[in-house]
Amino acid sequence: MTATGSGPLAGVRVVELAGIGPGPFAAMLLADLGADVVRVDRPGGAGLGIDPQHDLTNRNKRSVVIDLKAPDGAARVLRLVERADILIEGYRPGVAERLGVGPRECHARNPDLVYGRMTGWGQDGPLAQRAGHDIGYIAVTGTLGMIGKPDEPPAVPANLVGDYAGGSLYLVVGVLAALQHARADGGTGQVVDAAIVDGAAHLGTMIHGMMAAGGWQDRRGVNLLDGGCPFYGSYRTSDGAYMAVGALEERFYDEFTELLGITEQAPARHDPARWPELRAAIAARFGTGTRAHWTAVFDGSDACVAPVLSLREAAAHPHMAARGTFVEHSGMTQPAPAPRFSVTPGSVRRGPARPGADTAEVARDWGVPGIAEPQNSEPQMSELPKSGPRTSASQQSEPRITHDRRAGPHQRGNR
């Protein structure tokens, strides 16, 4: 099995200090695009409770096990750092420093390193030292309060909006931008502070603009894109399934109402006072047929209607299947790498890394034979941090990108 692929990040080396949630997902994105990601697992695992062979966020990576609380733990990680482009960590602020692998120690070994920090609350602020999870982060940014019906509690969007959209994706953008700077003439490494609260808030930029212009009410379930509009929402079918409707533009709306058979109610689109009447007409009509029936009715149209599928159903959808949006690897159906590149495509090259399984291989490929030697796992009490590495599903590691270190520490790669 190859260590890296032919994706656009081939040759980029990433050290990921094991965590759960957005940090590992960010590192997976980099690995999917060809980066050589080495995950530093802790003895006993990260505490996610998932069998490592099913943890898809660790695909395309290699793993070594290092006890950072042991006397030589930090030194082993720093040997990897010398040859890395990116480091990702998701501890609470100050923990990496107490473990001896904070930005100061890492940049002393490798000034060009992009040091990515993934947390929920950020590196500073009144809540920086508090525990948290996705739902709390999106709650205080106003994001959670936007989702759901006006007379019901906010709907919980799994952990996709905070952990992965507001966290992982912003971390990846940040470290890639920092890598570009580090590789520019006169550039250097730096710290990327990726906080889920910052990213989740940033996702709402357009909504804030609409609110300032008077086009968005600061309450859920009454606006154009939050379910308040009857032609942008989901409707139950006769078999208990759902169809999603997004017929916003008038020409799409006209096609939608014609195919649904409610042209008489179509003019209600222009009168919000009649929206309850329009919603009732749409709901009643969808309730007369199954999901399969309505899928066939709208197939090939520009009415912007789609069946609401389950996770297991999605891979078999004709469009998903034609594009290869899902792939089979390591006995599991899983999303293929995204986005797609015409010249340097990413791929799923290897299954989820098993803790410590690749130590000898990494020691050879990265030129750090010392990490393959037995570790003294008994920590000296003076070297233990006041509190061990604590991560939540949202306080994860962050990715960093630097240059090729194959010739040794401090050498810049070709620009």
Question: What does each of the following model-derived ranges do?
Answer:
Residues 1-185, 353-354, 358-375, 401-415:
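N-terminal helix-loop segment corresponding to the beta1-alpha1 unit
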Residues 37, 299-313, 369-371:
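Short, well-structured beta-strand/strand-turn elements
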Residues 47-53, 311-357:
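Active-site-adjacent capping/gating segments
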Residues 121-122, 196-201, 239-241, 247-252, ...:
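Glycine-rich beta-alpha junction loops
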Residues 123, 152-161, 183-200, 220-227, ...:
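Conserved Rossmann-fold dehydrogenase catalytic segment
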Residues 141, 167-190, 202, 206-214, ...:
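Oxidoreductase and adenylate-handling cofactor-binding alpha/beta cores
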Residues 226, 231-301, 305:
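Aromatic-enriched alpha-helical interface/lid elements that frame and gate functional surfaces
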